[in-house]
Swiss-Prot record:
PROSITE patterns xref list: FBOX
Highest rank taxon of the organism: Eukaryota
Species of provenance: Arabidopsis thaliana
SUPFAM superfamilies named in the record: F-box domain (SSF81383)
Name of protein: Putative F-box protein At3g23970
Amino acid sequence: MNIPPELTFEVLVRLPLKSLARFRSVRKEWKLVIDSEFFRDCFMSHNSSSVSWSIIQTRPHKLTLEIVGHHGCKTWGLTRSPGSLVGFFADTTIKRLRVLACTDGLVLIYTETSYGTPMHYVGNPLFQEWCPIPLPSYFYLQSVERIRNHQRFNDSALVIKMQSGAVVSYKVVWLFPRNSTTIDFLIYSSDTGMWEARIATCLHSSFWFSHHKPIALNGILHWLCNFSTSFVAYDFYGGHDDYACHIISFPDCEKDDDQLRRFRRTLSTSDGSIVYFNEFGENGNRRLRVWRLVKYTGGPEAWQLFWEVSLASVTKLGIDYFPVVMHPLKSEIIYLWSRNKKGMVLFNLRTNVFSLHKESEDETKCMDGCTLSFNRCSEYMETIHNYGGPNYLLASQYVLPRWLHRLPRPQPS
């Protein structure tokens, strides 16, 4: 029976990506429809409100990587959280495996064979596609030993180039602080399959790097530092004209704001931007301020204050909390961890409505319509609460893309 093309289109565009991936491999006609730009644009316009994502912790060698998962959204139609889908199957015996970075649906992992050979892979866990990343041909023996001895995990990162909602390129980045003013980058590109060495200027680079894992967004890596009121950013897809890192001051680095600020500084991402948030107390009032990074400069014009709300609705319940992340798509939702309630508070900044979700409870629906699940989240939150320093990356997000994409691979020469 021949199905009219118009009906095929209307049926397919209402299916989740999980089903589209299966139908795409069944019939050539369906594949042609799904792969068209018009179909992709229609699908994304119908599914712009929610997507599966995870809150991941920054110490994966101590606990599980995913501490909070979101699944069951309309876009993907997953019945499990994204973190539970991260699996790796090798042809040889693996004695050690570690997830180094997650961004835009791709994962960078480190493995070590039973013979002690270190290997890195970039993969798409949903489709079980993995690409081995070769070591640079000029890599020194002592550098390999540093990898084997687990001294290079905070220095590894993954940046992505997106186009029309799909990943078209990625870069694996290794960092080697050289001295107080320069940093060496080793960069592997999926476009060329080659490594590139790059030297960038950065003030006090030995203090910036290796202390925290970076946050990747739009091909840019962002690093916090415990010793400064600023953070560092570097654009790996910005061309070769600018070899300098951007040093960006936090919007509350003035003395008066610093005295009123309650929490350590941290960064998150939301709605395509880097965001910074904190609580400020003045005259007995507690208010939450959220800034969006709009320019990669060092002055006050770098930030836009787009939320300032009273915390009376939260604090009247006696909730002792600290901020964790923003919702990656909905910039009005912030995630707070309540220590005395031992649960995650989802606070809507627009409506001042909040909901409390406990790890001990069954999976529940959250504000974006996804199903919320926990995995040793309470244990991790108690651990990081005791960490010192004025700045700290508490957690980051692993967000699945809004469209199907295969793993980018180098073009054959």
